[in-house]
């Protein structure tokens, strides 16, 4: 035999990416990032602690100053809850129309 049936191949590396959509206020941003990356989150008091820095925007109906208004949205499986103004919504609104993209691509 010429050894055709014995192909030695390297093991394949498979990486699973679990996409999550998170909405938070400026005060909790660092904490959320550290929770998602697995690092300890110790956030010092900052300018967002004063009532005058509060602009009244909250997510999911929370309205008390200092209230944790973070939301964690599942992603990738299609079962997550999406807010009305997300990064993707803004991205898609700013994108050119498909006809423009096709024209640009065909000219290249």
Curated annotation (Swiss-Prot):
Keyword Nucleus: yes
Intervals of motif VQ: 29-38
Keywords of the record: Nucleus
Compartment list: Nucleus
GO biological process: response to oxidative stress
InterPro entries per UniProt: VQ, VQ_1/10
The keyword Protease is assigned to this record: no
Major site of localization recorded for this protein: nucleus
GO cellular component terms listed in the entry, alphabetical order: nucleus
Functional note: May modulate WRKY transcription factor activities.
Descriptive protein name: VQ motif-containing protein 10
Gene that this sequence comes from: VQ10
């Amino acid at each position: 035999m010429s050894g055709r049936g014995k192909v030695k191949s390297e093991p394949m590396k498979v990486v699973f990416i679990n996409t999550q959509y998170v909405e938070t206020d400026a005060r909790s941003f660092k904490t959320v990032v550290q929770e998602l990356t697995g690092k300890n989150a110790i956030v010092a008091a900052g300018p967002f602690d004063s009532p005058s820095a509060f602009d009244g925007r909250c997510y999911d109906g929370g309205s008390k100053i200092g209230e944790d208004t973070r939301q964690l949205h599942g992603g990738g499986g299609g079962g997550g809850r999406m807010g009305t103004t997300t990064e993707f919504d803004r991205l898609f609104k700013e994108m050119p129309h498909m006809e423009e993209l096709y024209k640009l691509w065909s000219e290249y």
